[in-house]
């Protein structure tokens, strides 16, 4: 009789060993899971300084002396999908804290949670409405003609559109994992989206459900995102630090607002189906989005292993804009790792801060002054007012 290649006693021994480890983990689990856990996210102090409908503007409090803070503030625009809290997961793993420590005066858009009344809001409403109002608010608060702008994922696409339509208001533009070229077969998402019947989906749901989009993202890599991840959790269930980090990430992943229906419809049709943006053919608010009008400095980050927004979707942008000061940075990480991995934490935030500081020193812009003509009009108005008051006294 032939001997088995793997003796049964070896298999049984391995099973017994694994069972012993599982039992040890299970014995520790109640102490960890039922004990005090620090799973709070987005704990960095901020003030809500502007509100419009569901949209809020966060202004983070400085952590260094005011005189050391960069004069030109940075506005960060996150995607409509998921929440901006991912940039502030925990101390030591927070893009927000890193930027503050490096002297950035930081603002962040909180898109909130769309309701049924928001289903007809378009890209124009978000870019030329909410974003433009927020940019004007910050410019007025700081008495500056231009501010710095940074976009993340779909929020980065919005920032590219905004900078092309309102270049006079943006000093420096930073894009991170930002899709602009949708004519690529890299990544399953781009292949899927080309055949999505977006009209049927939006007509049926109104707003695009966040839970449905989350399921779609999980199905892009089900083995890793739906099996391996939870196997890893079970194997580390007795490790308090691991459990806390795991829960923080799960909180962010499954905090998924719906996306306004008309915005989703236009984004899928104009970008995924027709690839209009990178060709400077996309129309927003009745105006063509001409990328050549992006003449301000541009810093473009993307991840080498990003399965949602692959390098091919990001790296073309710098060759299509009108700016002569552009830089591409490809990090050895994925879509989320660029913001939360320990290695990228040491490079991502400091690189952005350093880049902005260099350009702040190169070209210092004067503060906004009221136009002389407007002053003259004001004086005439005052004169008329005084004259009319004298007549009334008589």
Predicted regions and their residues:
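Alpha/beta-hydrolase-fold enzymes
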Residues: 1-18, 140, 144, 159-262
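Alpha/beta-hydrolase active-site loop
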Residues: 120-141
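Alpha/beta-hydrolase fold nucleophile elbow
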Residues: 131-132, 141-154
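Short beta-strand/loop motif that positions the catalytic acidic residue
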Residues: 294, 300-302, 306
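Conserved alpha/beta-hydrolase "acid-adjacent" motif
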Residues: 307-313
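Catalytic histidine-centered segment of alpha/beta-hydrolase-like enzymes
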Residues: 308, 328, 332-347
């Amino acid at each position: 009789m032939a001997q088995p290649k793997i003796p049964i006693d070896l298999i049984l021994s391995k099973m017994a060993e694994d069972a012993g480890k599982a039992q040890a983990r299970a014995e520790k689990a109640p102490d960890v899971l039922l004990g005090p856990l620090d799973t709070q996210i987005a704990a960095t102090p901020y003030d809500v300084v502007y509100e419009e409908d569901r949209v809020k503007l966060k202004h983070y409090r400085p952590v260094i002396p005011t005189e050391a803070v960069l004069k030109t503030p940075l506005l960060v625009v996150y995607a409509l999908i998921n929440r901006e809290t991912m940039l502030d997961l925990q101390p030591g793993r927070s893009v927000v804290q890193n930027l503050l420590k490096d002297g950035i005066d930081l603002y962040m858009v909180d898109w909130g949670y769309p309701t049924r009344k928001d289903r007809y809001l378009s890209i124009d409403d978000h870019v030329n409405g909410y974003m433009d109002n927020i940019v004007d608010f910050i410019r007025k608060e700081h008495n500056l003609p231009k501010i710095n702008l940074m976009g993340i994922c779909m929020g980065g696409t919005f920032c590219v559109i905004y900078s092309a339509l309102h270049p006079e208001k943006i000093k420096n533009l930073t894009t991170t994992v930002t899709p602009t070229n949708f004519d690529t077969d890299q990544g399953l998402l781009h292949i899927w989206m080309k055949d999505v019947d977006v009209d049927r989906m939006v007509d049926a749901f109104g707003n695009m459900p966040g839970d449905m989009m989350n399921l779609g993202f999980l199905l892009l890599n089900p083995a890793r995102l739906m099996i391996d991840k939870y196997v890893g959790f079970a194997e580390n269930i007795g490790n308090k630090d691991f459990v806390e980090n795991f829960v923080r990430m799960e909180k962010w992943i499954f905090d998924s607002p719906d996306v306004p229906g008309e915005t989703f419809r236009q984004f899928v049709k104009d970008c995924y189906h027709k690839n209009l943006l990178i060709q400077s053919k996309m129309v927003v608010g009745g105006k063509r989005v001409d990328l050549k009008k992006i003449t301000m400095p541009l810093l473009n980050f993307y991840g080498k292993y990003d399965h949602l927004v692959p390098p091919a979707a990001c790296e073309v942008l710098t060759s299509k804009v009108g700016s002569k000061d552009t830089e591409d940075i490809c990090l050895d990480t994925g879509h989320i790792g660029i913001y939360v991995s320990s290695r990228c934490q040491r490079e991502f935030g400091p690189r952005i801060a350093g880049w902005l500081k260099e350009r702040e020193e190169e070209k210092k812009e004067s503060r906004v002054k009221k136009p002389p003509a407007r002053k003259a009009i004001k004086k005439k108005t005052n004169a008329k007012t005084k004259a009319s008051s004298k007549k009334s006294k008589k």
